[in-house]
Amino acid sequence: MKICYRIAQRDWLKDESFEALYRSIEKWKNNIDELALFTGLAHLGHYPVAFARKCAPILKRRIIALKEIGIPSVGVNMWSTLGHVDESWDWVEAPPFQTVVGHDGKTSLGCPCMRNEGVLDYIREIYSIVATAQPDFVWLDDDVRMQHHMVEFPCFCHGCIQKFNRRTGRVLNRERLVKALEAPEQWKLRREFLEFNRQAMLDVCKAAEEGVHSVNPAIRTGIMTTDMAWNSYALSDQEGMLQAAKAEMVRPGGGFYNDETPTLLFHKLHSVSLQSAYAPGIPDNQYELEDFPICRNKSVHIHMIELTGALMAGCNGLALNSVIPNETEALMTAMERIRPMWNRLVKANAGTELRGFCPVYVPQCDGAEFAAHSVFSHVSSENLSNETAPMRMGMAFTPLPENAEVCTICGDMMAAISDEEIPRLFSKGVLMDAEALEILIRRGYGDLAGCRPGTPYHDGLLERYTPHSINGAMAGKERDVFMTFWDREGITVKTLIPQEGAEVLTELFSITGQNVGAGATFFRNHIGGRVAVLSYFAWKHQNTLGKAETVPCLMDALADGRFPVKIDGGTHVQAMLRTGDSGFTLFLTNTSFDATRELHVHIRARCRKATLYDTYGQELPCASEMDEQGNALLRLPALAGWGAYTVIAE
């Protein structure tokens, strides 16, 4: 595995700063495999060419000096290509080309239009200048995306609208184009526009690659990627962007800047697993450890959990922001201590896949025919986030449906699933909400779900668990989220009308005691699948009464008794499981501040020998045996609050 540090330009550009950096790197060089030196002026999208030319010889000297003290690989991270935000416009010359314009007419001060021919020429030039410093590699950062360049949904400048009109044979101005894109019946136009955006991203990546390789074809290129759903406005074509850049490196990132809400880490780890899955064949996969704005926002303890989780999510390297030469003694010491375990974990993970449930994501979700949401929204990201809800009950996850026994589908993500894929998904296990059910019925597949939507209600409902085997001891108990606290205007809960063969898991009651109908159903369909539909706050308030007790049982029932990992002894233990022909790896994190009981972990895999490590990579005793079903059973000591275990099994 590889550990890389990214170094801010302020730490290498001036001699006195570089001397301090040099001393720190000399001290820790045995734990540093790679350095990436930032180039550019802050987050704005224009790196003045004259300044870049002035910096390039200095950059070259720094690279030579760092390699001379034993750093194996030293390269460059372009801070900005298109710009992250408008920043420092009072101090830096304005871009000499068109900046991006939003759908609302708002114009960026410093982020260039990605379709402008002058901009593509500038990108080629600026990357070629950086390449003259002869770095081992050049990273494109995560500003290479359509969205969030100060204006949220670009680009609607005159030039872009003219290009789109020529491409599609239309005559539209900004206002008419925006109105048309918002019309539900204009889904083909939306798809054309999103494809237009996708091509713009490919052109930018290609221009950067051409700039680098015009100087030296041996310089490796890489892209820092972001949450797939953040890029739905350009059809989330991460794989195409990597190919256009001829990338040999990928750096999944996005979010989790501090540990104030530590459970958000697992949303990022799911995102990283998805980004990694859409980077097939890329040999160098480095996790981006975010700590923006580059400060001590996280404890060393959380760093250990986060970085081990990243290796479980599919990365084989770690990229940290410029923590040196700042105060890093405790972190660097902890990383030195845990490194042997990380090395073994990366080796064991080779050839394995994550197993668990899959939150379904379709890159074309914003351009689907039955999608009801605005193309100028973040609904796709919200849907994907909702689909990860079973993670809050500790359920192991996988980014790909083919590696899952159960898939979760939220809202109009259902609209984007292809006609070929629907039977494949619904022949296994599916957990979905009432909104997804309605779209499934509109598409002609309602017979796969076992129910249809009934009467809508806007307030005053709770759900009661029925005496079903899935509910166990929760039978007769009530779950009340006090629904009108959360969205007085927009809340709608619909009853479900079960079809023949469907089993009712919960019933909806008014606060005055009136039974208004089913709130959750379970159904075995005619193609062999198991389907659960939840209509009462399917994805929210997962810690309300009954969820921790019933979700694991429901997921196992949807998997037909084959969910790959079951944990007894703690209701807030998040699992990540990878399996392969030669064994499995398991990562457990207690996401509660209370210790668990002794953990009994059942794994649907064989186990000859298991090695257990604590949060800091120290080996612990581990008892492994086979359970009555012939699967691995691990008996692990009680896990402390916000502690972690890593298991490597052969």
PLM regions with names:
Residues 1-58, 87:
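N-terminal substrate-binding region of glycoside hydrolase catalytic domains
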Residues 5-18, 108-122, 291-300:
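Active-site mouth loops of central-metabolism enzymes
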Residues 28, 33, 38-41, 136, ...:
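Hydrophobic targeting/anchoring helices
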Residues 32-36, 58-106, 137-147, 218-222:
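Glycine-rich, aromatic-flanked loop segments that form ligand/cofactor-binding clefts
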Residues 32-39, 130-145, 318-322, 405-413, ...:
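Short acidic catalytic loops
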Residues 73-133, 169-194, 198:
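Active-site-adjacent "subsite" loops/lids of carbohydrate-active enzymes
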Residues 140-189, 226-230:
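Active-site-proximal loop/short-helix segments
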Residues 381-382, 387-388, 393, 397-402, ...:
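A conserved amphipathic helix/loop scaffold
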